[in-house]
């Protein structure tokens, strides 16, 4: 026998050894499962019995006492706001949502948690929203950093700055009107004479004297094009194409080089483009992020790679690239055009420092998220309520007919509609019943604790107060709190109106309130006035009693089929 061969173990010995190991596999797996369970469950049970935040006395779902997985599961099922509201109806104004988190529901509680004197900071929940290393004004948890950003960005959303952008925004209202006019032509679409068809990605059909289509995508096309033009100097082109896609650079590196004003790469970055379904990407990313945000930080990367979260996980770099490409295109244009990015480029903090590449990119991404989705959601929901009640629609149209009599433009001028009592009431009611974010956004109780509704919450406790429940409080809004009733804003006494305003927070309140409030209100006034002055909208006979929603981070309408007709 060869000497080298004699050094090898006999084949039979190897087989026996392998068989021995194979027989141990079930035991090894059992040990591993026990170890994982011990590592996962032991701290949970220990925290429950130690009760470090003294929350055991507060009612809530059984699983919520032990784990944040309960609230994450509810969010992943698109039932966040409504489920928390149900918990409050069952258990009262204070409900436990996780081992360290309570939800408090009342006007006084909302002010205590989010008001200027609160002292509470944003919770670790917001860490999940960081798509860049540098935080945005939305997801930063540092008070000093937020104050610095607010000083730089507040001017961008001042009433004067917003009014200066009205002419730019008007273009996209005009495109929306042109597209809807084409759909409303006698044949349903210009010259075809067909009873049904498609315009871009939107299916339509003619039935009776109306054209029927889903209006939700149109509101998204409009809002994405408007914010991209106002922020970056050019629209994504969704309205013209009737398609929810945008073009991004194939290379993040080239986008970064362009944003860094390395002009040798600017043309190259713009020429190599990839089309992505931007609207879908944004929805997937928000659903993915908020579903994981309440889980422990070490769990999030693991869960993020599960098949059920794959689309959301893949959406993050796509949205980052969308913001990088938008900034790169704007920088490469070298225009002196006044827009939001020019305000960010000129902005300086108290030390005279401008925003760097990372900060520009993360704030650009926030503009796309906030401007591309939130106003569209509220617009669609409000249109749904108006189309559902033809008496409300007729009353609104009568007011608009007087206010816009003699106006030649197809688009309602803001000055002509900004102070119309019934339109204001309709918009307020839409924001009340369908504030884009209905859930309570979490804060951390500061040093020294916090007293809410007579209960002392210890330092480090996570606390939130849900807008959805605040806006449906029957003690304030009456027995018809869940109904769309604009007249409540006109019929209330001075004292009742004051109480209503204290319970009305569609843009939140305090130092972290939405900076884009003025822009959102301007856009809502122009959009709803333009649509309902020009068109009549109705719902299908078999329309759902409630607008179907994805109730995650944003309360996003899934579909809203309307029959549209040009008014005579």
From Swiss-Prot:
It is a single-pass membrane protein. Heme binds at residue 514. GO terms for molecular function: heme binding; iron ion binding; monooxygenase activity; oxidoreductase activity, acting on paired donors, with incorporation or reduction of molecular oxygen. It is an enzyme of class 1 (oxidoreductase). Pathway: Secondary metabolite biosynthesis. Keywords: Glycoprotein, Heme, Iron, Membrane, Metal-binding, Monooxygenase, Oxidoreductase, Transmembrane, Transmembrane helix. Its main location: membrane. The chain crosses the membrane at residues 21-41. SUPFAM superfamilies: Cytochrome P450 (SSF48264). It is found in: Membrane. PANTHER family: BENZOATE-PARA-HYDROXYLASE, CYTOCHROME P450. This is Cytochrome P450 monooxygenase 89. The lineage of its organism: Eukaryota, Fungi, Dikarya, Basidiomycota, Agaricomycotina. The gene is CYP089.
């Amino acid at each position: 026998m060869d000497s080298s061969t004699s050094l090898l173990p006999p084949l039979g010995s190897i087989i026996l050894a392998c068989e021995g190991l194979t027989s141990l596999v079930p035991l090894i797996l059992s040990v591993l499962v026990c170890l994982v369970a011990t590592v996962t469950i032991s701290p949970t049970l220990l925290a429950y019995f130690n009760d470090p935040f003294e929350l055991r006395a507060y009612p809530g779902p059984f699983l919520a006492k032990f784990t944040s997985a309960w609230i994450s599961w509810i969010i992943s099922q698109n039932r966040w706001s409504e489920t928390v509201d149900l918990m409050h109806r069952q258990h009262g104004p204070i409900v436990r949502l996780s081992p360290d988190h309570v939800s408090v529901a009342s006007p006084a509680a909302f002010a205590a948690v989010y008001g200027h004197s609160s002292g509470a900071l944003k919770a670790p929940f917001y860490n999940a929203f960081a798509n860049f290393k540098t935080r945005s004004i939305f997801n930063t948890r540092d008070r000093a950093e937020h104050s610095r950003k607010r000083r730089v960005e507040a001017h961008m959303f001042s009433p004067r700055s917003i009014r200066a952008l009205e002419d730019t925004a008007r273009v996209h209202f005009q495109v929306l009107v042109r597209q809807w006019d084409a759909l409303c032509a006698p044949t349903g679409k210009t010259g075809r004479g067909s009873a049904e068809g498609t315009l871009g990605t939107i299916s339509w059909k003619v039935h009776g004297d109306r054209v029927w289509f889903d209006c939700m995508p149109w509101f998204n096309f409009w809002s994405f094009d408007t914010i991209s033009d106002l922020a970056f100097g050019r629209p994504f082109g969704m309205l013209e194409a009737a398609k929810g896609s945008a073009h991004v650079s194939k290379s993040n590196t080239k986008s970064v080089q362009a944003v860094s004003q390395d002009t040798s790469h600017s043309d190259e970055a713009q020429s190599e483009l990839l089309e992505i379904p931007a609207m879908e990407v944004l929805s997937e990313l928000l659903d993915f992020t908020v579903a994981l945000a309440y889980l422990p930080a070490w769990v999030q990367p693991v869960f993020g790679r599960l098949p059920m979260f794959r689309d959301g996980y893949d959406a993050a770099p796509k949205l980052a690239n969308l913001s990088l490409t938008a900034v790169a295109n704007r920088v490469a244009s070298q225009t002196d055009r006044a827009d939001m990015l020019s305000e960010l480029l000129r902005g300086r903090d108290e030390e005279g420092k401008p925003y760097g590449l990372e900060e520009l990119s993360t704030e650009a991404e926030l503009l796309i998220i906030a401007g591309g989705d939130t106003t569209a959601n509220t617009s669609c929901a409000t249109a749904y309520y108006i189309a559902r009640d033809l008496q409300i629609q007729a009353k609104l149209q009568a007011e608009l007919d007087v206010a816009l009599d003699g106006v030649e433009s197809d688009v309602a001028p803001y000055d002509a509609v900004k102070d119309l009592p019934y339109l204001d009431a309709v918009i307020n009611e839409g924001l009340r019943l369908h504030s884009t974010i209905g859930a309570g956004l979490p804060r951390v109780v500061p040093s020294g604790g916090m007293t809410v509704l007579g209960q002392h919450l210890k330092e480090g406790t996570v606390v939130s107060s849900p807008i959805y429940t605040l806006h449906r409080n029957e003690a304030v809004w009456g027995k018809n709190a869940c109904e769309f009733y604009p007249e409540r804003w006109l019929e209330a006494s001075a004292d009742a109106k004051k109480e209503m305003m204290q319970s009305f927070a569609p843009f939140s309140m305090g130092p972290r309130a939405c900076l884009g409030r003025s822009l959102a209100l301007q856009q809502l006034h122009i959009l709803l006035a333009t649509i309902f002055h020009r068109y009549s909208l109705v719902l299908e006979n078999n329309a759902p009693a409630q607008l179907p929603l994805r109730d995650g981070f944003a309360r996003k309408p899934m579909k809203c089929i309307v029959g549209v007709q040009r008014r005579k």
